[in-house]
């Protein structure tokens, strides 16, 4: 066991360089949660699978990432913050290389599971390292910088992924992590190695970890495969649902009675932590789910190229980047609950604007809600992160950061699956309702079909095919 008093804050160039290195590692992690969004149709086509199956590349990464995050506390106490952070970066680089060379979907999914698992400690440890490196009176600034990287990654991912997929090859959306990761690992080690945290040997909560993996994996597979297997008409889906429910119940009981739990659920007795974690998790699930769906809709129904759909989502970052540093300055003088409430109102307005989208939507009408969404994004992460960590003793911050990041990441995976399934279900419903009108006895349909045949010089079969394509859109 090693012990030492907490080191003082960094200053000058070491603080600046260390902040950049830690932020780059965090950026690399969150970037990979969204960079594949616009590449899913291309990846699916190259690997010979459906777009729905291709979406597993995103959800399986998030699920593996969520499961590994709670291990951060135990691993940190066993090996130390700096060693664990640098090792996670290097393993993330290796997993990224495996993703890039994957010849088929099962291999890619296995590499993404590894990538998500080793990325688990990056978010909570980057937060802890930044808070320890900055003076306590400037902790709001440190949180703002951390939140900015957490924001910019998902925002930059679609545009960067679209450009790489269109001009190069989808493999490079993973290869770009290699130089960034090596740089971040080297600089972090140089700057922070003499600030290693105390280590001690603790028993690992093996039962809690296995229960966590069991219910999370069962729930995620159920959500991803439900549509293909006709949901609860399938005994497989029923079994997965029962396993997820029972596993979750046993997980709760075990973690609340275990002396060294893998997830410290007692943190939820802190009102600020509980409310902030629930709010940030639910909101991130909605945000990330739409971030995954929009590029696929633009490519599948509007005819956008990968690079075009990426650029259409890029304006999300304009206000988010500009306003996040401002949030860090005004947060100490403002009640963060008011800012978070305004952010939720802003999200509601943006989602209402998107309900007016149709197949002939103009580019400006498509981009405007995305541009405006950057405002509530900036007012969302920083205040809620401050609420989550407020009032906690320093020794509880790593566990609290890990648990809140678990909730956020897990809800991102679940939100993606739920929104994708809802989209597919509504598409089928509206297709059925529209095709119900496609009968020779319907004079309006017959007239419109004749008009299409005359205008486009189509045969009867081609006119019906044209109608079916229009309905699908």
Language-model region placement:
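Hydrophobic transmembrane architecture of multi-pass small-molecule transporters
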Residues: 2-3, 8, 183, 407-473
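Transmembrane alpha-helical cores of Major Facilitator Superfamily
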Residues: 27, 59-63, 90, 144-148, ...
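Transmembrane core module of solute transporters
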Residues: 13-73, 77, 96, 106-108, ...
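Helix-loop junctions on the cytosolic side of multi-pass membrane transporters
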Residues: 186-206, 253-262, 359, 425, ...
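Residue-level hotspots within transmembrane alpha-helices of multi-pass secondary transporters
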Residues: 38, 70-71, 125, 155, ...
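Small-residue-rich alpha-helical segments with characteristic i,i+4
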Residues: 145-147, 153-158, 162, 290, ...
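Helix-loop-helix hairpins in multi-pass membrane proteins, especially solute transporters
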Residues: 69-208, 235
């Amino acid at each position: 066991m090693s012990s030492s008093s907490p080191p003082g804050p960094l200053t000058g160039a070491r603080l600046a360089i260390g902040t950049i290195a830690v932020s780059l590692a965090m950026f690399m992690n969150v970037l990979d949660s969204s960079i594949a969004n616009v590449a899913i149709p291309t990846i699916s086509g190259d690997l010979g699978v459906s777009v729905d199956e291709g979406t597993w590349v995103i959800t399986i990464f998030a699920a593996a990432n969520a499961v590994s995050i709670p291990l951060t506390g135990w691993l940190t106490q066993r090996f130390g913050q700096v060693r664990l952070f640098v090792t996670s970066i290097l393993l993330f680089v290796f997993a990224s290389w495996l993703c890039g060379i994957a010849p088929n979907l099962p291999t890619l999914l296995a590499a993404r599971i590894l990538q998500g698992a080793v990325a688990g400690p990056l978010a909570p440890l980057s937060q802890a390292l930044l808070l320890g490196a900055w003076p306590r009176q400037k902790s709001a600034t440190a949180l703002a910088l951390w939140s900015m990287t957490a924001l910019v990654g998902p925002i930059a991912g679609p545009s960067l992924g679209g450009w790489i997929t269109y001009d190069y090859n989808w493999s490079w959306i993973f290869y770009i992590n290699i130089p960034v990761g090596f740089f971040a690992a080297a600089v972090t080690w140089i700057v922070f190695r003499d600030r290693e945290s105390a280590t001690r040997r603790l028993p690992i909560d093996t039962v809690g970890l296995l229960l966590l993996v069991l219910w999370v994996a069962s729930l995620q597979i159920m959500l991803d495969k439900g549509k293909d297997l006709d949901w609860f008409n399938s005994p497989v889906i029923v079994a997965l649902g029962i396993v997820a429910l029972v596993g979750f119940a046993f997980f709760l009981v075990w973690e609340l009675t275990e002396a060294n739990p893998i997830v410290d659920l007692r943190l939820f007795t802190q009102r600020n932590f509980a409310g902030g974690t629930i709010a940030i998790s639910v909101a991130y699930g909605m945000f990330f789910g739409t971030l995954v769906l929009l590029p696929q809709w633009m490519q599948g129904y509007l005819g956008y190229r990968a690079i075009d759909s990426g650029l259409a989502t890029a304006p999300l970052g304009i206000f988010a980047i500009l306003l996040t540093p401002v949030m860090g300055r005004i947060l100490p003088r403002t009640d963060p609950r008011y800012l978070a409430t305004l952010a939720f109102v802003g999200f509601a307005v943006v989602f209402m604007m998107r309900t007016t989208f149709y197949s002939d939507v103009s580019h400006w009408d498509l981009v405007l809600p995305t541009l405006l969404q950057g405002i509530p994004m900036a007012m969302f992460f920083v205040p809620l992160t401050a609420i989550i960590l407020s009032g906690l003793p320093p020794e509880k911050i790593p566990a609290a950061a890990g648990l809140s990041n678990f909730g956020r990441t897990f809800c991102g995976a679940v939100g993606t699956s739920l929104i994708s399934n809802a989209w597919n279900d509504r598409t089928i419903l509206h297709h059925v309702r529209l095709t119900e009108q496609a009968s020779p006895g319907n004079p309006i349909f017959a007239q419109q079909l004749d008009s299409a045949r005359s205008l486009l010089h189509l045969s009867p079969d081609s006119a019906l095919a044209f109608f079916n394509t229009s309905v699908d859109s």
